[in-house]
Amino acid sequence: MHQQLQNIIETAFERRADITPANADTVTREAVNQAINLLDSGALRVAEKIDGQWVTHQWLKKAVLLSFRINDNQLIEGGETRFFDKVPMKFADYDEARFQREGVRVAPPASVRRGAYIARNTVLMPSYVNIGAYVDEGTMVDTWVTVGSCAQIGKNVHLSGGVGIGGVLEPLQANPTIIEDNCFIGARSEVVEGVVVEEGSVISMGVFISQSTRIYDRETGEIHYGRVPAGSVVVSGNLPSKDGSHSMYCAIIVKKVDAKTRGKVGINELLRSID
């Protein structure tokens, strides 16, 4: 459906080092802007689940990267201050009717860049959502949360205060970080480098997970990398070295819960009863 658009972007990306705001041709500029608009509206997304597997559409990520090559910095008005950046703000032209129509609540001074999709019944406290991100319905993005470029946030997710969800642009990553539906990410936790937190998982406060973080399941003894299995309750911890001379940080799966249990038991209770 978007093959021609993809072809233009793929071709332009191969010569991206030579592209500047001054010399970007009309075809490339229009293709990139169209791709960003499709991301902004949610019509397309950088990653989606197909037949149970997450698939990254690399050409859309390339469109995001190209947008930084073709656009110059410009003055951006924002409340009582001004900004100077290449990417305009998503809500710059919204009026009350459009906010009502799209069903999004935005508390000042939450910032969302154009090219990020924010679904209905989402609440944005003072937070930051970067270009290419996808935030699905019913999600709470709490105070001082950062949702990185192209990150994928599922339905009914709670991102607690100060949570960091890593992006793909800086440093450049192959795949976006993904938080699936009905997950809870505790305050000040960080999930980065394309890690996938699968559906219904609960991450405690202050847990840091990257591709190199060992995710230890204490019930089975398994160690996972880059993926938190569905329904996991995860806390921070340590694992001893082979010679016992020291221990190193890890994330520990202390239990598994299903949707029925989550529905009956509060998040705090799940995290308190881990012994």
Curated annotation (Swiss-Prot):
CDD domains: LbH_THP_succinylT. The keyword Nucleotide-binding does not apply. Keywords: Acyltransferase, Amino-acid biosynthesis, Cytoplasm, Diaminopimelate biosynthesis, Lysine biosynthesis, Repeat, Transferase. Substrate binds at R105, D142. NCBIfam families: dapD (TIGR00965), PRK11830.1 (NF008808). HAMAP family: DapD (MF_00811). This is 2,3,4,5-tetrahydropyridine-2,6-dicarboxylate N-succinyltransferase. The gene is dapD.
